Amino acid sequence: MYKRQVYSEAVGDALAYVVKARVQLLRDLGASNSADSAFSLIQGIETLSLRLERHVQNAQEIAEWLDARDDVAAVWYAGLPTSPWYAAANRYAPRGVGAVLSFELKGGVDAGRALVDSLQLFSHLANIGDVRSLVIHPASTTHSQLTPEEQLTTGVTPGLVRLSVGLENVDDLRSDLAAGFAAARAVTEAGLRAS
């Protein structure tokens, strides 16, 4: 107790001045955005609900389209009535379940790689949540260092493709994916002819 009293008596007013100066400078100059950053932040927040509606709508349409295709073995998207998570999704996310979905492409690793490589609108990235549509084939990219057995243990199958559906026109996205499926089919057929 004595040391604290001596310190405050010795520093006293000077310490108060340092605290006041620091608080005042922080208030006057401190951690604030630049005008451009603040404008961008406001614009982003004001349009967020519209963008999310478009993400969800596009993802739902793409999932339904994929689910109807013969070259797709399965689609994992909680917004589909066939999904085991459909009831929970409707209960917890009644306005839509998001824009990320996965599907199992028939034809394996080579078909998955061919599909991703041939896409023009979808960017080949491991991210999610961008305004642009993104695609990745985990077996040939993010999980390629694992053995096939280890990949299966982590849930990565040879034909697994993950999409993060963006804001583009959904007809353009379907056309891009259709071209990707054609490339995957060509690789699969070439492999069958070779064997």
Task: Please give the residue ranges for each predicted region.
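Active-site C-terminal subdomain of aminotransferase-like
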Residues: 3-100, 104-116, 121-132
